[in-house]
């Protein structure tokens, strides 16, 4: 199960990136096997996949680079988690990740916090967004197709500028040693 919705025209240039993001997860799966998923390793791993997807979409991406941060007390040195650029547009991204239970997908506060952090990245005139990766889990057994569809429906209720999700069939039974099943990943983007 895979899809994307872009609600903000300024982020339309990310459509091929979000499509190739799932392809990058599939490539990882081909090499690492069904017992390992890149998206449960945290924000840095997911940022790397999104950067790889940008390059595959013939855009440019740069992770973890030094730059100016804007705060009330003025400008200071900081870092940006990711930038994605086309010939016409550049997006500066602050990234975070959450691992909620499948039935508890209210990520509104986490998305607002991530977008607030993104406001400090780059200059006020530059396009900025918070990117929240969501790796939902379920205890004891894998998620049914109906539960995954409910999850996607819940994701679409968020006031995000762009939403992408990928719940690959190969990972439907992926779980850790605690019996937590991680069926896939979603990405919420909110312009700062």
Tell where the protein language model's regions lie, with residue ranges.
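Residues at beta-strand starts and edge strands
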Residues: 78, 89, 180-183
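N-terminal cationic-hydrophobic initiation segments that often serve targeting/anchoring roles
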Residues: 55, 118-122, 156
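Interdomain/boundary linker segments immediately adjacent to catalytic/signaling cores
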Residues: 1-49, 53
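Glycine-rich, aromatic-bearing surface loops/beta-hairpins
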Residues: 127-192
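A short acidic/basic microdomain associated with nuclease active sites
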Residues: 54-75, 80-85
């Amino acid at each position: 199960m895979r899809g994307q919705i872009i609600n903000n025209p300024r982020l339309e240039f990310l459509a091929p990136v979000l499509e190739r993001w799932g392809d990058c997860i599939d490539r990882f799966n081909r090499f690492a096997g069904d017992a390992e998923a890149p998206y449960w390793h945290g924000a840095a791993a997911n940022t790397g996949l999104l950067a790889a997807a940008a390059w595959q979409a013939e855009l440019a991406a740069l992770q973890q680079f030094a730059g100016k941060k804007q705060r009330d007390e003025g400008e200071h040195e900081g870092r940006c988690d990711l930038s994605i650029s086309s010939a016409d547009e550049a997006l500066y991204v602050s990234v975070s990740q959450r691992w909620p239970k499948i039935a508890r997908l209210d990520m509104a506060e986490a998305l607002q916090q991530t977008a607030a952090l993104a406001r400090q990245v780059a200059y006020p005139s530059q396009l900025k967004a918070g990117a929240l990766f969501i790796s939902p889990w379920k205890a004891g057994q894998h998620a049914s197709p109906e539960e995954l569809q409910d999850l996607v429906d819940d994701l679409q209720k968020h006031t995000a500028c762009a939403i992408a999700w990928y719940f690959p069939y190969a990972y439907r039974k992926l779980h850790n040693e605690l019996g937590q099943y991680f069926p896939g990943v979603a990405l919420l983007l909110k312009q700062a």
